[in-house]
């Protein structure tokens, strides 16, 4: 996962909110089956899209961030641009859906 940055409560602000490029954040958990299926899709997106920073947050390692952002189910993808939340998708999401989601939300 060299193209995916692991983020937790300590570095969320720096890695996501202060990023100069759009950031796709994959919220999941080790115990979540669909999250494990989402991971290789997110990794492929990260490899194919160098203009978007991709971060992975395990909600058990980042309970403050997960609570603050209202994460109720996983996997959840959230997109941030210029430090602001611009959209989310809940549930297992295909590579094409992720690409379209990011493109429509960031132009």
Regions found by a protein language model. Give the residues of each.
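Thiol-based oxidoreductase modules, predominantly thioredoxin-like and allied folds used
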Residues: 6-8, 27, 39-64
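Short pre-active-site segment immediately N-terminal to redox-active cysteine/selenocysteine motifs
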Residues: 20, 28-31, 73
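Structural micro-motif
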Residues: 23, 63, 69-78, 96
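A short, hydrophobic beta-strand/beta-hairpin element that forms part of a small beta-sheet core
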Residues: 24, 42, 75-88
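The canonical Cys-X-X-Cys-His
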Residues: 32-35, 77
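Non-catalytic, surface beta->alpha helical segment in thiol-disulfide oxidoreductase systems
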Residues: 81-107
